Amino acid sequence: MSWTQENVDFLRGLGKRSITLNDYVKAYYDVEILPYDISLNPILQKVIDRVYEITKEAFDNPQHEYYYAPNRRINEYGNHVEDVLCQAIEDVDGTEAKNLGVGYPDVRTKLGGYFLYPECKISSNIDEVGSMRSFYTSVPAERTKKIKNLQDGMHILFKFHHNGPGVLTGRHKVFDLNGMQYVSEALQQGNDKNVYACKMLFG
């Protein structure tokens, strides 16, 4: 027999399930997502303004730290804008925006006495609400949990409108992710070591 009842029962319990981001951070980091505090509005607006200032300063200036060449891939521009956002936070508030590494959340800062976890996205059409995946989380390794060391805090998502690599148009949307619902899906994955450990029929 190549299956076990325990694994069968486990797999049958998996599948699509609607969860909240709050569930995710509580389950894996044992922390709470706090509702956005509107007292942060003025400083957040300054941060957004600074993002555009840095982008304009860097545009067409290859010597600038945040220059983004027009021939670079657009799907890497989102990570670049996130770096600009981190710099903008430091410029405006003097607070370090720390990169936490791969996996959600990947940036932490502190504004107005609150821990803030900003997520940054770009889009050529920020008014379009599509069904393509634009946000995801994954089960963190124990080492990742220790490195990220999450605290209770606010989780917000910046979505900037772009007109090609290196060009932000000045339009944006900012979302409070507290209570955000999304779908948890079971995923099984293997590699060639798993396959090659099987009985080979030809070859």
Locations of the language-model features?
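Nucleic-acid endonuclease domains
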Residues: 1-103, 116, 122-203
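Active-site beta-strand-loop-beta-strand hairpin of nuclease catalytic cores
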Residues: 108-117
